[in-house]
A protein has these predicted regions:
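Conserved catalytic core of the tyrosine transesterase superfamily
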Residues: 1-202
């Protein structure tokens, strides 16, 4: 009997609802320097869909305020300029003005306690996201790191009418299959959009 080949995207992506994401963001103490930092980080994760490592490697030089863009070092050594939404920009500005400790370090986000240096990897960003979820009372995602906000953004965009192609471009998916996986959470939307997606409705 031939073995059954398991498709690598067979499982549904885990995501938070828009209301849950808002609850996580609202749970940040934006009156404290650490809270401002964490809020800005969570905004980048939830509004731009950045990966934990992409947030950790952002530097002060990567932000072009005049152009309203941010240079992101993406997976696979890709580099791309992303537009900064007003609410995301406001969160970053609030952190830089009233939250970021004085430091010669060029990383955008630094540790709250001395030494005020950047994070070595995305692990710290993942922990910040996990603590924020737990603080908001959102449990049951023990194995989900910061990536759950990326999944949530893609799912919300799909349900708001964005095409799979647009979502794939925003999240820099190399494979169409990666983006199609998000469509599984809404079969009705998948059927409506598949005709405009390469290889769809076969």
């Amino acid at each position: 009997m031939p073995s059954i080949r398991q498709w690598r995207f067979a499982s549904l992506p885990t995501y938070l609802s828009a209301a849950q994401v808002r609850t996580v963001l609202d749970g940040c103490d934006r009156a404290s320097s650490t809270g401002r930092r964490d809020y800005a980080i969570l905004m980048l994760l939830s509004k731009l869909g950045l990966r934990a490592n992409e947030v950790a490697t952002l530097t002060l030089d990567d932000v072009d305020w005049r152009a309203g863009e941010m240079l992101v070092r993406a997976k696979g050594r890709q580099r791309a300029a992303m537009p900064i939404p007003l609410d995301v920009g406001a969160a970053v500005v609030a952190y830089l003005r009233d939250g970021r400790p004085k430091s010669s370090c060029r990383e955008l986000f630094v540790r709250s306690l001395a030494p005020h240096i950047g994070f070595r990897s995305g692990s710290a960003i993942t922990m910040i996201a996990k603590i924020a979820r737990e603080r908001a009372g959102i449990r049951g995602y023990a194995r989900q790191g910061a990536h759950i906000f990326r999944h949530s953004l893609a799912t919300e965009l799909l349900r708001s009418g964005a095409t799979l192609s647009e979502i794939g471009q925003l999240l820099w998916h190399k494979s169409h299959d990666t983006t199609r996986n998000y469509a599984k959470v809404d079969i009705g939307a998948l059927r409506a959009l598949s005709l405009s997606w390469p290889g769809g409705a076969q």
